[in-house]
C-alpha cells in the first residue's frame, strides 16, 4: 500500500539531491562546455511523492541541456556516461549506481530508503527538448520528443490554480495503489488529465 511522503521527511532528501544536481550542472559546464538546468518532474514538482510499504520512494528529476557541442550530440552513450561519472564523483559514497533504465539513470542512496531517477534532456535545433533514451531491443541511444512532459506541467498549473490539488492527490494515490506495477509517471499523467476534466469550464 502506497502512502504520501510528508513534507518534513521529504525536505532532507530533496535538499540533498538538489545540492548534488546543482553542482553537477556546474561541473558539466566547466568541464565540457555544456549549459544545463535542473527540473523536478511529476510528483516531485507537485509535492505528491509516494512511498511503498517499506517506506521507500523515488525522486524524479531531469537535467536539461540547452547547449551541447556537436561531437557530444554524436555520441549520446558517451554523454550519458559523462553525466553518470560526474554525479558519482560529486556524490561519493552517498549514492551508488543502480540499474540503467530506458529513460533515466537510477542512483540508489546508500543510507536512506530512496532513489534518484535522473532523466537527460537535450534541446534540439527547433528549441524543443528531447529525452535521451535507450531502445530496449536495439540498445541504441536515441532522442525522443517530450511534448507530454511540458503539456503535463501546464495542466498541473491550471489544476492547482483552480483548487484541484486535493482531488489530484486523492486520484493519484488511488490509482497508484490500484496499479502498482505501472510506471508512476504515467499514472500521474493519467490523474492529471482526469482532474483537468473536472476543473476545466464546461463548454456552453
Task: Tell me what each language-model feature is.
Residues 198-204:
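Conserved small/polar residues in nucleotide/adenosyl-binding loops
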Residues 115-163:
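Extended, alpha-helix-rich binding/interface surfaces that flank or overlap catalytic cores
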Residues 57-97:
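Aromatic- and glycine-enriched beta-alpha-beta binding-site module
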Residues 163-179:
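Transcription/chromatin regulatory elements, primarily intrinsically disordered
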Residues 28-59, 63-73:
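Active-site nucleotide-donor binding segment shared across nucleotidyl transfer reactions
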Residues 32, 80-126:
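Conserved catalytic core of two-metal-ion nucleotidyltransferases
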Residues 189-192:
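Long, charge-rich alpha-helical interaction segments
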Amino acid at each position: 500500500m502506497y502512502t504520501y511522503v510528508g513534507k518534513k521527511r521529504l525536505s532532507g532528501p530533496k535538499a540533498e539531491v538538489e545540492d548534488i544536481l546543482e553542482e553537477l550542472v556546474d561541473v558539466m559546464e566547466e568541464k565540457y562546455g555544456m549549459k544545463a538546468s535542473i527540473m523536478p518532474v511529476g510528483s516531485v514538482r507537485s509535492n505528491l511523492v509516494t512511498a511503498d510499504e517499506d517506506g521507500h520512494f523515488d525522486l524524479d528529476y531531469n537535467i536539461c541541456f540547452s547547449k551541447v557541442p556537436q561531437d557530444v550530440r554524436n555520441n549520446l552513450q558517451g554523454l550519458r556516461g559523462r553525466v553518470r561519472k560526474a554525479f558519482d564523483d560529486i556524490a561519493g559514497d552517498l549514492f551508488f549506481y543502480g540499474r540503467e533504465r530506458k529513460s533515466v539513470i537510477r542512483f540508489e542512496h546508500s543510507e536512506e530508503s530512496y532513489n534518484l531517477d535522473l532523466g537527460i534532456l537535450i534541446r534540439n535545433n527547433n528549441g524543443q527538448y528531447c529525452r535521451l533514451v535507450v531502445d530496449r531491443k536495439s540498445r541504441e541511444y536515441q532522442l525522443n520528443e517530450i511534448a507530454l512532459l511540458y503539456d503535463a506541467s501546464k495542466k498541473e498549473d491550471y489544476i492547482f490554480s483552480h483548487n484541484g490539488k486535493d482531488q489530484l492527490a486523492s486520484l493519484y494515490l488511488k490509482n497508484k495503489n490500484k496499479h502498482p506495477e505501472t510506471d508512476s509517471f504515467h499514472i500521474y499523467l493519467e490523474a492529471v488529465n482526469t482532474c483537468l476534466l473536472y476543473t476545466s469550464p464546461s463548454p456552453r
